[in-house]
From Swiss-Prot:
Biased composition (Low complexity): 478-493, 755-796, 828-847
Function of the protein: Transcriptional activator which forms a core component of the circadian clock. The circadian clock, an internal time-keeping system, regulates various physiological processes through the generation of approximately 24 hour circadian rhythms in gene expression, which are translated into rhythms in metabolism and behavior. It is derived from the Latin roots 'circa' (about) and 'diem' (day) and acts as an important regulator of a wide array of physiological functions including metabolism, sleep, body temperature, blood pressure, endocrine, immune, cardiovascular, and renal function.
Compositional bias segments (type: Polar residues): 447-463, 856-865
Source species: Spalax carmeli (Southern Israeli blind subterranean mole rat)
Highest taxon listed in the record's lineage: Eukaryota
Enzyme Commission identifier(s): 2.3.1.48
Protein name in UniProt: Circadian locomoter output cycles protein kaput
Enzyme class: transferase
Length: 865
């Protein structure tokens, strides 16, 4: 019993121990599991952080185009850190001592400030005098661009009297190879001398001016200088110079002005096209200045408000600025010239301003002027000034070596035809980029990225000749006009050379397919331009040929035409106008004998004999007789009837009196542009009445007896009364008309008809007094039917004998005038036989004494219009 109890106790104890052990094991497993979970979490977090750091480190390494594993990233990081440690050690050796350089300034800024404070610039010269480097600060001191000095000899800028001394200094102070030590910055090899240097000018024709300067420097060997201390200096040396010297020794000096400049031009432009805005009053006082101005000019807005802009301008630019401002006041907007503005740091910066005037919105009065100022470099200013002076300045060959490697200089602007033509003209010689960077290059000794951007090429390469734009256009037009005479072949002749050159143009080494396709596109554009110009030239040629054909037709029409000379006396002076006859039968023209003007009968033979023989006395008597007879006959109106009639539509003007022709000119007092003069060319042989001129009002018409005739219609154009025109036999197509004397007659039409007939049978002089009485009665009856006409004064109708005397002397005394008259008139002297001529000469006095009413007919036969 007891054993049984004990056994049960023991079994219960064992069961309890097993359960406790199991529970303990379960607890331990739970603890281990929790530890593992926490450990895994921490490990995952650590791995994630490590991967993030590796990824970030890989992104900072160069050449991370492809995905790198962790070991590669770590290896490159180690290499970079090792190289950085070496560079840092070398930089510490060349670092400017901190005891005299402010900590907030970099080496680059400190060097620039030191050069400005010393009024100096850096210059690197080879032992033979070739300049291989010059700093930008030379512009503010000597007004030279760095590109003007680089690759030039220093002796070109030194007076001839100092050449020998400077050459001796450069050639005798050479460093030996054993003396080159790492302590090259020390002054044991320092060289110092003084000389004169040439100042730069905008106009090369100005007289030379030299500045006294001091050279302080050392001879340095580039082989002993650490690469990090080159500062990009090696990259600035021309490639043509690099193999030219074996020892790589040059003289690096600081050039200082002996006389310091207190105000200098700012030689560098940190950012291209920097600009700021300001507002000015009409008196040019500052009213507003934006936030971009202080970093450029140094002034805060409150420092300049209320001050005049002219206080900050250079004295040499005031005159040009005043002209620009006057232009602004006249036109309301404009652009100024380049001018210098004084900054707060006492430096001159070059600006160009675009301005316009704003007006008040209510009263439209000028309110203020808005200006936008742009900072420009001295290189742009000098180039613009030289273009104004007519000096062609070639573009600086900036970065020529780099452009040769990259092939970027072979690109053709597909928009500009001019540049494409220049490319084809100068295809063997590569050119530099047309636009160089305006970013300032600094002169520091530790920044390898600060290198100049304007380095010219070797001087052995001949520069491209630049012609003015108008000369290029003239040459191009002349070449086009010479080739366009053959319109059938001008197109192929212009385009085939371009196409063949495009086909044979090799692809330069290093040029991409895109660049070559750009060239082909430019050539195609050039071809289209040439074809379009060819079509325009062909159209111009066709138009000119058509005009030439019309001119030839007009010349044929006027060729061989005869001329008639008429003289009108409307004032005491003589006025002449041109009269032209159309081509017709010359025999009919030569048969015209008498001329009836204002009732006067003057035979043509008398005029011809008076012109050829020079009977001055007879001519004077003839003019006096004609004037007296004209005065007596102006009191009546007359009409003429014959077998055939001719009508002309010109309104009358009674002050006009035609006398015998002396010149081949005629003046018709008529302001109306639609007036016409009709002159018959032939007359019947057997006519019993002589035609006269009858003057009516504008609602009447005149009828004349005519035979077969040839009429020329001449459209007249008004000119001044004093104009005299003597047309030639080839180019005659107008009649010059003079304005009438009185304004009341300017709106009236005028009718004038001149007929020529064969001479009638002359009547004895004794019968004329007997016929005067019936003729006067007939005239009085005719005046009752016709309207009254105002009578001219005796002074207007009388021709001065002295004028006729001078005219006769002019005709008979000048052989060239007789030659011109003989060439202008197709009438031949053989037409009038000598006997017939003498017969008319003997009857001259009888014809002068006749009254103009001998040929009057019955007034009832006149048919009014």
């Amino acid at each position: 019993m007891v054993f049984t109890v004990s056994c049960s106790k023991m079994s219960s104890i064992v069961d309890r121990d097993d359960s406790s052990i199991f529970d303990g094991l379960v607890e331990e497993d739970d603890k281990d599991k929790a530890k593992r979970v926490s450990r895994n979490k921490s490990e995952k977090k650590r791995r994630d952080q490590f991967n993030v750091l590796i990824k970030e480190l890989g992104s900072m390494l160069p050449g991370n185009a492809r995905k790198m594993d962790k070991s590669t990233v770590l290896q490159k990081s180690i290499d970079f850190l090792r190289k950085h440690k070496e560079i840092t050690a070398q930089s510490d050796a060349s670092e400017i001592r901190q005891d005299w350089k402010p900590t907030f300034l970099s080496n680059e800024e400190f060097t620039q400030l030191m050069l400005e404070a010393l009024d100096g610039f850096f210059l690197a010269i080879m032992t033979d005098g070739s300049i291989i480097y010059v700093s930008e600060s030379v512009t503010s001191l000597l007004e030279h661009l760095p590109s003007d000095l680089v690759d030039q000899s220093v002796f070109n800028f030194i007076p001839e009297g100092e050449h020998s001394e400077v050459y001796k200094i450069l050639s005798t102070h050479l460093l030996e190879s054993d003396s080159l030590t790492p302590e090259y910055l020390k002054s044991k090899n320092q060289l110092e001398f003084c000389c004169h240097m040439l100042r730069g000018t905008i106009d090369p024709k100005e007289p030379s001016t030299y500045e006294y300067v001091r050279f302080i420097g050392n001879f340095k060997s580039l082989n002993s200088v650490p690469t990090s201390a080159h500062n990009g200096f090696e990259g600035t040396i021309q490639r043509t110079h690099r193999p030219s010297y074996e020892d790589r020794v040059c003289f690096v000096a600081t050039v200082r002005l002996a006389t310091p400049q207190f105000i200098k031009e700012m030689c560098t432009v940190e950012e291209p096209n920097e600009e700021f805005t300001s507002r000015h009053s009409l008196e040019w006082k500052f009213l507003f200045l934006d936030h971009r101005a202080p970093p450029i000019i140094g002034y805060l807005p409150f420092e300049v408000l209320g001050t005049s802009g002219y206080d900050y301008y250079h004295v040499d630019d005031l005159e040009n600025l005043a002209k620009c401002h006057e232009h602004l006041m006249q036109y309301g907007k404009g652009k100024s010239c380049y001018y210098r503005f004084l900054t707060k740091g006492q430096q001159w910066i070059w600006l160009q301003t675009h301005y316009y005037i704003t007006y008040h919105q209510w009263n439209s009065r000028p309110e203020f002027i808005v200006c936008t100022h742009t900072v420009v470099s001295y290189a742009e200013v000098r180039a613009e000034r030289r273009r104004e002076l007519g000096i062609e300045e070639s573009l600086p060959d900036a970065a020529a070596d780099k452009s040769q490697d990259s092939g970027s200089d072979n690109r053709i602007n597909t928009v500009s035809l001019k540049e494409a033509l220049e490319r084809f003209d100068h295809s063997p010689t590569p050119s530099a980029s047309s636009r160089s960077s305006r970013k300032s290059s600094h002169t520091a000794v530790s920044d390898p990225s600060s290198t100049p951007t304007k380095i010219p090429t070797d001087t052995s390469t001949p520069p491209r000749q630049h012609l003015p734009a108008h000369e290029k256009m003239a040459q191009r037009r002349s070449s086009f006009s010479s080739q366009s005479m053959n319109s059938q072949s001008v197109g192929p002749s212009l385009t085939q050379p371009v196409i063949s050159q495009a086909a044979n143009l090799p692809v330069p080494q290093g040029m991409s397919q895109f660049q070559f396709s750009a060239q082909l596109g430019a050539m195609q554009h050039l071809k289209d331009q040439l074809e379009q110009r060819t079509r325009m030239i062909e159209a111009n040629i066709h138009r000119q040929q058509e005009e030439l054909r019309k001119i030839q037709e007009q010349l044929q029409m006027v060729h061989g035409q005869g001329l008639q000379m008429f003289l009108q006396q409307s004032n005491p002076g003589l006025n002449f106008g041109s009269v032209q006859l159309s081509s017709g039968n010359s025999s009919n023209i030569q048969q015209l004998t008498p001329i009836n003007m204002q009732g006067q009968v003057v035979p043509t033979n008398q005029i011809q004999s008076g012109m050829n023989a020079g009977h001055i006395g007879t001519s004077q008597h003839l003019i006096q007789q004609q004037s007296l007879q004209s005065t007596s006959t102006q009191q009546s109106q007359q009409s003429v009837m014959s077998g055939h009639s001719q009508q002309t539509s010109l309104a009358s003007q009674t002050q006009s009196t035609l006398t015998a022709p002396l010149y081949n000119t005629m003046v018709i007092s008529q302001p109306a542009p639609g007036s016409m003069v009709q002159i018959p060319s032939s007359m019947p042989q057997n006519s019993t009445q002589s035609a006269t001129v009858t003057t009516f009002t504008q609602d009447r018409q005149i009828r004349f007896s005519q035979g077969q005739q040839l009429v020329t219609k001449l459209v007249t154009a008004p000119v001044a009364c004093g104009a005299v025109m003597v047309p030639s036999t080839m180019l005659m197509g107008q009649v010059v008309t003079a304005y009438p004397t009185f304004a009341t007659q300017q709106q009236q039409a005028q009718t004038l008809s001149v007929t020529q007939q064969q001479p009638q049978q002359q009547q004895p002089q004794q019968q004329q007094p007997q016929q005067q009485q019936p003729q006067q009665q007939q005239q009085s009856s005719q005046e009752q039917q016709l309207p009254s006409v105002p009578q001219p004064s005796q002074a207007q109708l009388t021709q001065s004998p002295q004028q006729f005397l001078q005219t006769s002397r002019l005709l008979h005394g000048n052989p060239s005038t007789q030659l011109i008259l003989s060439a202008a008139f197709p009438l031949q002297q053989s037409t009038f036989p000598p006997s017939h001529h003498q017969q008319h000469q003997s009857q001259q006095q009888q014809q002068l004494s006749r009254h103009r009413t001998d040929s009057l007919t019955d007034p009832s036969k006149v048919q009014p219009q």
